[in-house]
Amino acid sequence: MAANDRAAAPGKSGGSAGADGLMRASLSAVAPGTSLRDGLERVLRGNTGGLIVLGSDKTVESMCTGGFVLDVEFTATRLRELCKLDGGIVLSSDLSKILRAGVQLLPDPTIPTEETGTRHRTADRVSKQVGFPVVSVSQSMRLIALYVDGQRRVLEDSAAILSRANQALATLERYKLRLDEVAGTLSALEIEDLVTVRDVSAVAQRLEMVRRIATEIAEYVVELGTDGRLLALQLDELIAGVEPERELVVRDYVPEPTAKRSRTVDEALAELDKLSHAELLELSTVARALGYTGSPETLDSAVSPRGFRLLAKVPRLPGAIIDRLVEHFGGLQKLLAASVDDLQTVDGVGEARARSVREGLSRLAESSILERYV
């Protein structure tokens, strides 16, 4: 198999988070444009079935009976021909070789499975027992199913995936447009010191919505393989800066810890991530995830940013200097009021950098106000 035709080997699972990562790696390994996917499509078109284990170790070898050892380079045509045999196929862990063919796989029969067909039940049990992905090609149902540590994914053709991906991309464009609007409003309110918890929650809500739809599209990109290159470029352009902005908003507004309530930036981000779709639509729930009480009175209460988000927009300003400026001045309003001399009192800020920060903040303030009122 040519190196440029072969995706990265998926490896083995390791826990729930590992299973999710293995599923993505496995989808990439069988995506359109790879030799493995080409071979699977040939098997499907040839009206034959197949059971392919994507990896090998002592556990896999111990459950193999019959068949024969090959240890030959993987090619799509070889896979097609070997699937004509009545038995499973075992590939090397890097998917570069066909190790065994025509084998009968005997996984632990007590492993629970909801599959009905013999081939699919075996594939599900093998993937659960050995941790390697297993592909089952159904002759009667004419489908390719991927089993990864208890998860099952039916591989679709590119046209069906692209149709859903384009719908999701159109949704992302609308979400991003709305995010830009509320983020611009927040910037103007920050300059005027008129921000409420409601304003912050609205921006955090939109950032999370954009991030989630982008994650969904990223899954489509993985499934599409070479057919998803244009989609990947569009996605990268739309979500540029969204993840850093999400963290900056939380750093700016996560409440100061108190005796009754405290939440770190990482904890707030994790709480936002755990919100269900219905919960994300409620600003009060978003506010609680950020660390506020979420009551109607709290939503309308005033808050002031620390200044991380606006300082990050100043060109060529290192993160370490931003942290020192925020720590020294304690809030955005004091930063906006600081003179060049005041800024120079911060460690690492010389006259040139102080002037750059002063001019950068002034330009941001002017543009934010103009965008809101003009």
UniProtKB/Swiss-Prot annotation:
Specify whether Metal-binding is a keyword of the entry: no
EC number annotated for this UniProt entry = 2.7.7.85
Q: Which GO terms describe its biological process?
A: DNA repair
Swiss-Prot/TrEMBL keywords: ATP-binding, DNA damage, DNA repair, DNA-binding, Magnesium, Nucleotide-binding, Nucleotidyltransferase, Transferase
Residues engaged in binding ATP: 87, 105, 118-122
Matches recorded under PROSITE patterns:
DAC (PS51794)
According to its UniProt record, this protein's enzyme class is: transferase
User: Pfam families, per this entry?
Assistant: DAC (PF02457), DisA-linker (PF10635), HHH (PF00633)
Q: Which cofactor does it need?
A: Mg(2+)
Q: How is its activity regulated?
A: Diadenylate cyclase activity is inhibited by the interaction with RadA.
DAC domain span: 20-158
Keyword presence, Lipid metabolism: no
TM stretches of this protein: none
Q: List the catalysed reactions.
A: 2 ATP = 3',3'-c-di-AMP + 2 diphosphate
GO molecular-function annotation terms?
A: adenylate cyclase activity; ATP binding; catalytic activity, acting on DNA; diadenylate cyclase activity; DNA binding; hydrolase activity
Reported function: Participates in a DNA-damage check-point that is active prior to asymmetric division when DNA is damaged. DisA forms globular foci that rapidly scan along the chromosomes during sporulation, searching for lesions. When a lesion is present, DisA pauses at the lesion site. This triggers a cellular response that culminates in a temporary block in sporulation initiation.
Q: Which family does it belong to?
A: Belongs to the DisA family.
The UniProt subunit note reads as follows:
Homooctamer. Interacts with RadA.
- The identity of this protein, by name, is DNA integrity scanning protein DisA
Q: Name the source organism.
A: Streptomyces coelicolor (strain ATCC BAA-471 / A3(2) / M145)
| Gene name of the record | disA
